[in-house]
């Protein structure tokens, strides 16, 4: 579990370390080749899925013996947020996510939005949750 957490933290730090150096997330994203973008999205999907499954297994191990235990809301919410980053409609065709992220970063209002947050908005849109995706996009535009 610690290995996964360390890998996840290194992954996040690498993504967000681009911002202090003056490099915008959109410049980072648009500077990648198409195959690098697909690999990036594939890696992010894999890391999020692994993190979620590992957490489920650890919770199961910890509370397996307690029959009165009920899963708290914050754990369900954590899983829901993790699912927002993964598009089920796109399936294994990650090129769709890449093309939509390119389109998202084409708008100058979105240049400062972090790459993972952009992936979250695109995944929500792909899954048909347009209202939620638009609300999240407006929040991110206001924040960044």
Where are these regions (language model features)?
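Enrichment for repetitive, rod-forming helical segments
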Residues: 9-10, 44, 127
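Immediate post-signal-peptide N-terminus of mature secreted/exported proteins
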Residues: 18-54
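Compact alpha-helical subdomains of small soluble proteins
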Residues: 19-23, 54-144
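Sec-dependent N-terminal signal peptides
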Residues: 4-13
